[in-house]
Every structure is written in structure tokens, then in C-alpha cells.
Regions:
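Conserved beta-strand-loop-alpha-helix junction that forms the acyl-donor binding cleft
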Residues: 92, 118-127, 146-149
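Charged catalytic carboxylate motif
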Residues: 15, 35, 99-100, 126
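Conserved active-site alpha-helix within GNAT-family acetyltransferase domains
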Residues: 98, 122-141
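Residue-level recognition of the GNAT/N-acetyltransferase active site
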Residues: 70, 88, 121
């Protein structure tokens, strides 16, 4: 199966927020509609700190990828972090995720992004095999700690 990947804009807000709500419910994340809107609206309006790509047909997307950007001394420039990736359950395991990440990687590389990272959570994450298959490698040099500033 082949899926188009298109950068989402403000006209995609309703569908993006709906897909995000499904992902957050599936992952049992505590985010509400107000939080999702606060996160997505700036990116859909073109904020350079991140982007959302819709997967599949524009009228009925199959999922989305949300990437945030950061500057990396180690990489020598801009890097992307996959904050969220979601695919409707009915279309999973058909190669669409692989195609999607390839298309997003090509677009980011063309835009000068040096590396694309994904926080995969626990070492026993069932998606680890997927990440390895699509070319991501474990980074044993990095552990992340966080100070919540707001």
C-alpha cells in the first residue's frame, strides 16, 4: 500500500486534532482538547519549531507524524525529534509507516536537517523492531533528564 505524506496547515486543524485525540486515548495520555490545540495550532500555522505531516488521502488521513526541531552541536545543525506518530489501527502493518518515515526523512534532509530522532520509551517497547527496520539505531550515549519549566 502506498500513502501520500503532506505537510499539514491550518486548514487541517480539525482532522489533526481528531487523530491526535485517538493517539492520546490509545496511549492513555492525559492530554485534553485544549492541550492538543495549544500544541498543534502554532505548528499548523507554520511555526518553524515543528511540523505535522498527514498520512494518506487529504480528506480521510490514515495518521500523522509530529516532528519538533532543535539545534544540535553534536550533529552540526538542525535535528528533528519525532514527538508523535500515529496510524489508524485498521491500516497498520502494511508498510505505510515505513513509507511515511522515508518520505518525512527525505523532506527533512532536503531542508538541511542532519538527524531524525525518536524517543522510544522503554527498552522493551514493542515498536523497537519497527524503528530498527526503518533505519533508526539505538543511541547508547544518551540518557535524557527533564526539568519541567511550566
Amino acid at each position: 500500500m502506498s500513502a501520500a505524506v503532506n505537510l499539514a496547515g491550518e486548514d487541517s486543524a480539525e482532522v489533526c486534532l481528531g487523530l491526535m485525540a485517538k493517539y492520546h486515548a490509545e496511549q492513555d495520555l492525559p492530554y485534553d482538547d485544549a492541550h492538543r490545540l495549544a500544541v498543534a495550532a502554532p505548528l499548523l500555522a507554520g511555526n518553524p519549531l515543528g511540523a505535522i505531516w498527514l498520512i494518506g488521502p487529504a480528506r480521510a488521513p490514515l495518521g500523522y507524524v509530529l516532528v519538533s526541531f532543535a539545534w544540535s552541536i553534536e550533529a552540526g545543525g538542525m535535528v528533528g525529534w519525532i514527538s508523535e506518530i500515529y496510524m489508524r489501527p485498521s491500516v497498520r502493518k502494511r508498510g505505510i509507516g515505513t513509507e511515511t518515515l522515508h518520505a518525512v526523512s527525505v523532506a527533512l534532509r532536503a531542508g538541511g536537517v542532519k538527524a531524525l530522532h525518536a524517543d522510544i520509551g522503554a527498552a522493551d517497547n514493542p515498536l523497537l523492531r519497527f524503528w530498527n527496520r526503518v533505519g533508526f539505531q539505538a543511541d547508547t550515549t544518551r540518557n535524557v533528564v527533564t526539568d519541567i519549566l511550566s
